[in-house]
Amino acid sequence: MPQSKSRKIAILGYRSVGKSSLTIQFVEGQFVDSYDPTIENTFTKLITVNGQEYHLQLVDTAGQDEYSIFPQTYSIDINGYILVYSVTSIKSFEVIKVIHGKLLDMVGKVQIPIMLVGNKKDLHMERVISYEEGKALAESWNAAFLESSAKENQTAVDVFRRIILEAEKIDGAASQGKSSCSVM
């Protein structure tokens, strides 16, 4: 097996959308029912994707809103971003658009690995954002999209596998696009 690769992933989104629950479900395989607002946590996990082992460092950020100032650390050595909203919250869906814009401004790249996640899909009766709305937003960003339920452990692993694939796809395109110069 090839040597493991290290990847750092930031999880961003409005408060109470389930960023920590999704991350803990992936890392520890459990759902945390209580809610304590996150300041910032970092988790690590080994995962194998397509035969390649990855050592993931997951930065579970504090909830952002439209007025939040992004710390510069969210742009340094980050290989991919998971942007999370709740399918039960119009506000979180609107704020994720603002977060995406700020992220692009901060990182300064046209193409960055982004995974848009509509969380809390198990709350059918409270849903206000359709699957189609989430998918359309992700497509407008040229980003991957999944809906998830951290509580029911639906697609938590898929979310993190997918962001790795997105990061590798963009890394591969960037390395192929590099030009070389020869002096003779």
UniProtKB/Swiss-Prot annotation:
Expressed at high levels in normal adult cortex as well as a number of peripheral tissues, including lung and intestine. A lipid is attached at C181 (S-farnesyl cysteine). Mg(2+) binds at S20, T38. It is found in: Endomembrane system; Lysosome membrane; Golgi apparatus membrane; Endoplasmic reticulum membrane. It comes from the Eukaryota. GO terms for cellular component: cytosol; dendrite; endomembrane system; endoplasmic reticulum membrane; glutamatergic synapse; Golgi membrane; lysosomal membrane; neuronal cell body. The modification Phosphoserine is found at S130. Keywords: Cytoplasm, Endoplasmic reticulum, Golgi apparatus, GTP-binding, Hydrolase, Isopeptide bond, Lipoprotein, Lysosome, Magnesium, Membrane, Metal-binding, Methylation, Nucleotide-binding, Phosphoprotein, Prenylation, Ubl conjugation. Alternates between an inactive form bound to GDP and an active form bound to GTP. Inactivated by the TSC-TBC complex via the GTPase activating protein (GAP) domain of TSC2. Autoinhibited by Tyr-35, which constrains the active site conformation, restricting the access of the catalytic Asp-65 to the nucleotide-binding pocket. One of its GO terms (molecular function) is protein kinase binding. CDD domains: RheB. It catalyses: GTP + H2O = GDP + phosphate + H(+). Its EC number is 3.6.5.-. A motif (Effector region) lies at residues 35-43. It holds the Pfam family Ras. The modification Cysteine methyl ester is found at C181. GDP binds at S16, V17, K19, S20, S21, T38, D122, A150. GTP binds at S16, G18, K19, S20, S21, V32, Y35, T38, N119, D122, A150. Farnesylation is important for efficiently activating mTORC1-mediated signaling. There is a cross-link at K8 (Glycyl lysine isopeptide (Lys-Gly) (interchain with G-Cter in ubiquitin)). InterPro entries: P-loop_NTPase, Small_GTP-bd, Small_GTPase, Small_GTPase_Ras-type. GO terms for biological process: cellular response to nutrient levels; negative regulation of cold-induced thermogenesis; oligodendrocyte differentiation; positive regulation of oligodendrocyte differentiation; positive regulation of TOR signaling; positive regulation of TORC1 signaling; regulation of neuronal synaptic plasticity; regulation of postsynapse organization. The record marks Y35 as: Important for autoinhibition of GTPase activity. Belongs to the small GTPase superfamily. Rheb family. Small GTPase that acts as an allosteric activator of the canonical mTORC1 complex, an evolutionarily conserved central nutrient sensor that stimulates anabolic reactions and macromolecule biosynthesis to promote cellular biomass generation and growth. This is GTP-binding protein Rheb. It comes from Rattus norvegicus.
